[in-house]
Amino acid sequence: SSWLWGVMITPDNDVVQTGIINWPSHLCSFTGNGYTSGVPDGYRKVNSALYDLIPETDIRKQWFLSPDNKSSLIDNEQIEGTSIVEYFGLTPYVNTKFGAYQSIFGNTTNASDWPLMRVEEMYLINAEAEAMGGNLSGGKSTLENFVRTYRDPSFTSKANSAQDFQ
């Protein structure tokens, strides 16, 4: 709903008909037909050091499994009575952000749309333009309002200069 630019994919598109030569087969941890499915520890992950830098209050922390294999995005999801983590053999730090087609875990249709640019990017560009244009406090305010609303309610910019802000 906030996309400015994207590629809308349907099951009959060539990119889907090829099977695994597409976005979901590379990045979706929950597809039944992809580079990540069935390959021991073949899932896309975040580095543990980077994961540890994400504040607990930031929704982006839930885009990856925690060290104890938890993510609010999939904690209650199951296939045939088995947890998603167990069913797919997921391990800590695995990406949970990109869902399966039609939110059906384990399906083999890789027809997920591809977001290329979202409206949110314009807010970030505006914040940076304010800061780089000599209004650091305005840029920080724009950024803080955006991040607090959409990502992390406790976020505060620590930038002391326009260069720090970048």
Language-model segment annotations:
Residues 46-47:
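Periplasmic/extracellular electron-transfer cofactor-ligation site
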Residues 10-43:
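His/Glu-based metal-binding/catalytic segments typifying zinc-dependent metallopeptidases
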Residues 1-21, 51-166:
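Acidic/polar-rich alpha-helix caps and helix-coil junctions
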